[in-house]
Amino acid sequence: MSTLKVVSSKLAAEIDKELMGPQIGFTLQQLMELAGFSVAQAVCRQFPLRGKTETEKGKHVFVIAGPGNNGGDGLVCARHLKLFGYNPVVFYPKRSERTEFYKQLVHQLNFFKVPVLSQDEGNWLEYLKPEKTLCIVDAIFGFSFKPPMREPFKGIVEELCKVQNIIPIVSVDVPTGWDVDKGPISQPSINPAVLVSLTVPKPCSSHIRENQTTHYVGGRFIPRDFANKFGFEPFGYESTDQILKL
């Protein structure tokens, strides 16, 4: 059987729909928790604290969360990073009103004393300085993004593009400004230092700079027969790892 290493946006949506359908029964909250946990593990793998000075350990992981599910992954990621000993700060400029669940994610961040900045707080630009920030997590838009990019996110991404060569950016599933199938079609668009594909890589991942972007897959929640049904082989995660470097 021929296998695919990537799935289109249409197929990715079908996978999510079936996982959350009545026969399998995953909830969005469960999948988001596992996805955000895997992104946090990728940050830990790529930017380990072991052996770092106290000054380096004190740097922030700046998580920028969009209004949809990609942003929810970022909120979950920030909570786990706090538990892993990192110093996350979340910028959540346009909060989701879809369900109570997103509000609960913010309440959890407050419980763990993770700062959550709003659009009105102009000091978010202070976290785009390499002396203050270890890395930036781009959890703005995912595989459902369609251009044009609107404010406030257009301005935010323009600022990220100015610093992406001095502060590494970790993109969740699809780099913001990229079409999930065609790659970077929107200006501005991010060129991440790390890409964490969720469940299975999307076609846009073929456009990453192989010598400059580290690629992980995460979201370890599907068995072999389910993967084969959608035309790909499951990934060879080791032991209890939630991510695999590709």
UniProtKB/Swiss-Prot annotation:
Keywords: Cytoplasm, Isomerase, Metal-binding, Mitochondrion, NAD, NADP, Nucleotide-binding, Potassium
YjeF N-terminal domain segment(s): 12-234
GO molecular function terms attached to this record: metal ion binding; NAD(P)HX epimerase activity; nucleotide binding
Gene3D superfamilies assigned: YjeF N-terminal domain
Compartment(s) of residence: Cytoplasm; Mitochondrion
Keyword NAD: yes
UniProt binding sites for K(+): N70, D138, T176
Cofactor(s) the record lists: K(+)
Enzyme class: isomerase
Residues given in the record as (6S)-NADPHX binding sites: N69, N70, G71, G72, D73, G142, F143, S144, F145, K146, P147, P148, D173
Reaction(s) this enzyme catalyzes, per UniProt: (6R)-NADHX = (6S)-NADHX; (6R)-NADPHX = (6S)-NADPHX
Cofactor stoichiometry and binding remark: Binds 1 potassium ion per subunit.
Domain of life: Eukaryota
Biological process, per Gene Ontology: nicotinamide nucleotide metabolic process
EC number: 5.1.99.6
SS bonds (residue pairs): none
Principal cellular location given in the protein's record: cytoplasm
A cellular component term, taken from the record's GO annotations: cytoplasm
Additional facts recorded: Present with 1380 molecules/cell in log phase SD medium.
Function recorded in the entry: Catalyzes the epimerization of the S- and R-forms of NAD(P)HX, a damaged form of NAD(P)H that is a result of enzymatic or heat-dependent hydration. This is a prerequisite for the S-specific NAD(P)H-hydrate dehydratase to allow the repair of both epimers of NAD(P)HX.
Similarity section: Belongs to the NnrE/AIBP family.
Record-given protein name: NAD(P)H-hydrate epimerase
Organism: Saccharomyces cerevisiae (strain ATCC 204508 / S288c) (Baker's yeast)
Higher taxonomy: Eukaryota, Fungi, Dikarya, Ascomycota, Saccharomycotina
Gene assigned in the entry: NNR1
